[in-house]
Amino acid sequence: MDKRTEMVAGASRIFDLEGFRGVGIDRVIEPSGVSTRTLYKHFGSRDGLVLAVIEARHARFMQQLTLESGTDDPIGSLFDTLHEWVAEHGARGCMLLRARSEYASACEAVVTLVQQQKQEFLREVSRRVDLALGRGDEALALQIWLLFEGATASASVASITVINEAKRAALLLLQLAGDNVA
């Protein structure tokens, strides 16, 4: 693993567990054992590192979705992937939204990147709705996206089983949309 990748991985763990803005730079670089100078050489700033971390996190999640995209249940598998992700990484809500919240007035680049990533995920949900129904349904895609985002947040304050309930609701909405084809 190269230094840049190592710094992103180490900072990702720290940011995920301890937050973004309230953690000192020495703590952020501690897992990779690099100097502050090395951090600035690779990322230009702390915000540059934050951007790299949320880019990597989003890419990993989207890759995880791609790995299971061959399933015959394109909507249910979204929630199965979320369940696996939360079981592996912990239920702390969406790291991207936490970054956006902490940087809302401090770094427009973080806010913009998270918005773009959420739109990319909504497009993926929409693509899966198209696969499941054989036609587009943007309202249904938005509803399923909201269930997914809500389950991600709710799992952090309730039980991971809320993901299963969100899956059931999404599949019911999908069934209703399929039944209402004229």
Walk through the language-model features, giving the residues of each.
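Amphipathic alpha-helical interaction segments
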Residues: 48, 77, 81, 95-98, ...
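Amphipathic alpha-helical packing segments from all-alpha helical-bundle domains
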Residues: 62, 67, 73-76, 106-132, ...
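Short, basic, alpha-helical segments at the C-terminal edge of helix-turn-helix-like DNA-binding modules
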Residues: 55-61
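Hydrophobic/aromatic-rich alpha-helical bundle segments in the mid-to-C-terminal region
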Residues: 109-116, 131-182
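Short amphipathic alpha-helical elements of helix-turn-helix/winged-helix folds
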Residues: 10-14, 85, 124
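Helix-turn-helix
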Residues: 6, 10-48, 52
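Hydrophobic alpha-helical connector segments
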Residues: 52, 63-92, 141-144
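Amphipathic alpha-helical segments used for helix-helix packing
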Residues: 88-112
